[in-house]
Amino acid sequence: MFFDIVKALQCSWSTRRKRRSAPCLEIIRSAGHSLIDCCPLRGSWDEMTTRETTAYMPLNDMDLSLSLGDRFMVIAYGAIQWPWLLRSLDGGRKKDKADLLAYLDLPLDALPNLGSWKADTNFLWHIVSAIEDMRPAQVVELGCGASTFVAARALQLFGGGKIVSFDQHAEFAATTQSWILDNKMDAEIRHAPLGAPPAGWPGHWYQLSDVPKEIDLLIVDGPPWAIHPHVRGAAASLFPRIRPGGRVLLDDAARPGERVVARRWRKEHENMEFTLDSQGAKGTLLGYKHSA
């Protein structure tokens, strides 16, 4: 699938400072032969969560049955948004990451390598800033990982609110939960398999249960775009739960698919204000809910 081309771009990026390995060259060669491949790459569980490194590719969601239309959209958007995918390999400057960890009073090795499918430092700073400013009682997150770790630490420092995070991969959710607990922080991470989306939205969506009735901060960092470029738009189904004055943070907001989502959100939710911060590797959409 398009993952092969993304992986080839990753190999080209990662080998700028060193000679390309034989496996890398083979990936680059094979990527040109086929756009559709039923076996996208995945990382091991240890690679996904260790502080030293994480896998570049997200876990395999392709056991889902994608419609012909969804497959076409993924291929079409993949053809135009590869520059954003390539740019996203950069998780941010090492200094920015070090500054973030120092601000949270965490050791330099507390976070894994960032970038690719993971949050970059700019998005993580937005999470910390929102929590410090709002002191939210309830944070809800879609897609767990480094962002959950940072949000849990920020809540520990600023206000002591709660975070509930949903992720489609049960084992990854459990591993992330252990990672956070091992660092003496608090977060509730739940498995939410992907299934039918809310009416009016394409792709597949989290099958959510026991969602908090009121949300102060909604963090949207999943599902991955390879399910459908507009898949994260279904997060709007949670907007009625956001309290007046509450906020939304959407990761990867500079990508073409997320820009379409943002336009629709602005049109359909007049009581909310959305602003794009294009800084960082991937961009962040900042949402604010007015009182009426």
Please report, for each region that a protein language model flagged, where it lies by residue.
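Conserved SAM-binding motif I beta-strand of class I
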Residues: 162-167
